[in-house]
Amino acid sequence: YQMELRTKIILLFLFLFIGCGESGRATQSVLPTPEVKYTPGDIITDSQGYISYRVGNTPIIITVPHDGTLAPSTFPDRTGSSARAENTRKVAEQFAYFFNANSNGLYPHIIYNNISRSKLDPDLNQMDGAQGNSYANLSYGTYHSFLQTAIDSVEAYFDAGILLNLVEHNHSNQKVELGYLLSASDLDLTNLQLNSYSAQSSVSQIADISTSSFAEVIRGYNSLGTL
């Protein structure tokens, strides 16, 4: 199984650290969060089966926006990138399985888009992701509403959380990449220069609570990439 993943999957992990508290409330959508009680481990799906949410009880949120295969006729084809990020759903499910098996019944939150990226891309802003179609807009809203529910749960029960967005890159070097909202040119900077880029990174709050500098969090001996 591990060999299969090595040959077939190229992942970009986008780490978004969720800081909790009134001054730094994390938000993903202005849509109201459903007032529904969920059971950790359950999979909640909308009535069409287009968007799914595996309910969690940890400060870990995983999003899988680009591995859907459904192509409803009511959704016109989108313009722009539409490549499927194959196996990202499998990676999320395997992570959830092993995490649960080794943590005495704990679950990460996982949000799945089951619709083909050629029809819906919830990883973009709504105009580009749904492109004005009323049906696509509805599913886009459901995806982000589930995501907001997960964020609200993390904020309610934990001091901080982390969001892992599983997508695909097309680089010739087929390795797992960690995305921090920093460009390649940013990463070519010296440590002293890179330290000034903390605020624009998706892991700025990790750096804020770390005893290491921002540059060390990104590429030091104890950075996320060394785990």
Label every model-predicted segment:
Residues 20-22:
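N-terminal Sec signal peptide cleavage junction
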Residues 4-12:
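Sec-dependent signal peptide recognition
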Residues 24-227:
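N-terminal catalytic or cofactor-binding beta/alpha core of small enzyme domains
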